[in-house]
Amino acid sequence: MSTDELLTFDHVDIRFPIELNKQGSCSLNLTNKTDNYVAFKAQTTKPKMYCVKPSVGVVLPRSSCEVLVVMQALKEAPADRQCKDKLLFQCKVVEPGTMDKEVTSEMFSKEAGHRVEETIFKIIYVAPPQPQSPVQEGLEDGSSPSASVSDKGNASEVFVGPSVGIVDLIRMSDELLIIDPVDVQFPIELNKKVSCSLNLTNKTENYVAFKAKTTNAKKYYVRPNVGVVLPRSSCEVLVIMQALKEAPADMQCRDKLLFQCKVVEPETTAKDVTSEMFSKEAGHPAEETRLKVMYVTPPQPPSPVQEGTEEGSSPRASVSDNGNASEAFVDMLRSLLVPLFSNAASSTDDHGITLPQYQVFINFRGDELRNSFVGFLVKAMRLEKINVFTDEVELRGTNLNYLFRRIEESRVAVAIFSERYTESCWCLDELVKMKEQMEQGKLVVVPVFYRLNATACKRFMGAFGDNLRNLEWEYRSEPERIQKWKEALSSVFSNIGLTSDIRRYNLINKNMDHTSEFLYIVLILNFFSEISDMTGLTTSYQFLLMMKSNLISYDIYIYPTKFCVNVFIGV
């Protein structure tokens, strides 16, 4: 490869393992080692056989991007594994700030006199890797293991030798999706909804669609019940059981949960998934996994002893059937939050003027947010007598050090990510300061994704990513500053993310008496470990809090898994 190429590639050819009736894929890494914006376009000699995602794009200076080449499933093996197909990459220098959507075929036309660099790749068929056959301890090499799986995914019918565990057997199978755990366990608590989370992992190179259904649809529901798991990624599914009015006899349950999955076309989304895709009658074979539903005894937390009461006395607190937090639970939330937001100290600015201690710092971009979502949040906090800082309090034109002081004086920061957020270097500089305070244990940061797909945002896709790349180009002479921005974004994105819809908040805004309950839910998320300690909940116990009312037309589910809290907001 010559050193003056606009783009360099990590492969010199495209290799596909031949597996009949399965799509194959190969990823290419495109690296731009120049100081120019470089646009590219990919095309193949057989477009019906191969597709490239993305087929056009722009690689920023001194950066790289990944391209996935997908081959359609073969119905029969090619003779001698020979392939004459090729993949062509064309690339050229474009104007700074050019976006992916602005790349057109005309830009690469030689007839129009455009200088274009070309790279041609051969497509090669190779034999698929052969996994090693597992040999159980105590068996002769090559002998048949006594274990068998009669019902895929049914752990109770698998005999496992001493050296091969259930998880190992599942991992070594050729299933499209690996589901963890291997059964659905619900702790039995009368008059309470309970939930169980499942992790679906796709270790193939294909897009895999799934559909979930139960043998008792009135008793259980699954969120999401359909979806698409991208290649080499995973997703989480929540199974919820309706409240039981009486304990089942002998804790026995015959219900099952069925997952159907199949390979679909690249770029298929969840909204494209239909029941017909899994219909056997229509000739669409799907892989099926059945999970048993099991009832288990809930863990018994230690009995809390209130001051001034006898040990073992019955607690007064209870959770009402509608799922709202009980009076005792709300009191507990207040006991955690009040120390954070009471007894506010004051500070003095550079001109000797006494200012209130700002306890919540709101980091956002754009007047459209100030007049809608941010306005709601500020009102909700002020109703709770919490001091809030937004830039409407400060004089415009103040330097960043002044804003940094406001962050240092705050206990909680709310970072509201919108499409326009990454237009502002000030927002990102504030975020860097928030990250520093967070790492020192002085600040709790709550990220909110405002009308954004959280996953796309974390991958810097769409307008959010385009704006960031434009800002990187504008400040390309300050690489250390850019690196701090990216580190701050990644750090904050690893926290909980709430997905916001302004229409819902407008409804709440008309009835501000309901906002304090919602506010407590938002702020308490990052203190959940403290609640667990107070209530005796363990990390293996799934705690479900449902908030429902006529005003709020969606449920908020909160449950910790390995010290993480996941929030699902949906109609």
Curated annotation (Swiss-Prot):
<feature type="compositionally biased region" description="Polar residues">
    <location>
        <begin position="143"/>
        <end position="153"/>
    </location>
</feature>
<dbReference type="Pfam" id="PF00635">
    <property type="entry name" value="Motile_Sperm"/>
</dbReference>
<dbReference type="InterPro" id="IPR016763">
    <property type="entry name" value="VAP"/>
</dbReference>
<dbReference type="InterPro" id="IPR008962">
    <property type="entry name" value="PapD-like_sf"/>
</dbReference>
<dbReference type="InterPro" id="IPR035897">
    <property type="entry name" value="Toll_tir_struct_dom_sf"/>
</dbReference>
<dbReference type="InterPro" id="IPR013783">
    <property type="entry name" value="Ig-like_fold"/>
</dbReference>
<dbReference type="Pfam" id="PF01582">
    <property type="entry name" value="TIR"/>
</dbReference>
<feature type="domain" description="TIR">
    <location>
        <begin position="356"/>
        <end position="493"/>
    </location>
</feature>
<dbReference type="InterPro" id="IPR000157">
    <property type="entry name" value="TIR_dom"/>
</dbReference>
<comment type="similarity">
    <text>Belongs to the VAMP-associated protein (VAP) (TC 9.B.17) family.</text>
</comment>
<keyword id="KW-0520">NAD</keyword>
<dbReference type="GO" id="GO:0007165">
    <property type="term" value="P:signal transduction"/>
</dbReference>
<protein>
    <recommendedName>
        <fullName>Vesicle-associated protein 1-4</fullName>
        <ecNumber>3.2.2.6</ecNumber>
    </recommendedName>
</protein>
<dbReference type="GO" id="GO:0061809">
    <property type="term" value="F:NAD+ nucleosidase activity, cyclic ADP-ribose generating"/>
</dbReference>
<feature type="compositionally biased region" description="Polar residues">
    <location>
        <begin position="311"/>
        <end position="322"/>
    </location>
</feature>
<feature type="domain" description="MSP 1">
    <location>
        <begin position="1"/>
        <end position="126"/>
    </location>
</feature>
<feature type="region of interest" description="Disordered">
    <location>
        <begin position="132"/>
        <end position="154"/>
    </location>
</feature>
<dbReference type="GO" id="GO:0005789">
    <property type="term" value="C:endoplasmic reticulum membrane"/>
</dbReference>
<keyword id="KW-0677">Repeat</keyword>
<comment type="function">
    <text>May play a role in vesicle trafficking.</text>
</comment>
<dbReference type="InterPro" id="IPR000535">
    <property type="entry name" value="MSP_dom"/>
</dbReference>
<feature type="region of interest" description="Disordered">
    <location>
        <begin position="297"/>
        <end position="322"/>
    </location>
</feature>
<feature type="domain" description="MSP 2">
    <location>
        <begin position="176"/>
        <end position="296"/>
    </location>
</feature>
<feature type="active site">
    <location>
        <position position="430"/>
    </location>
</feature>
<keyword id="KW-0378">Hydrolase</keyword>
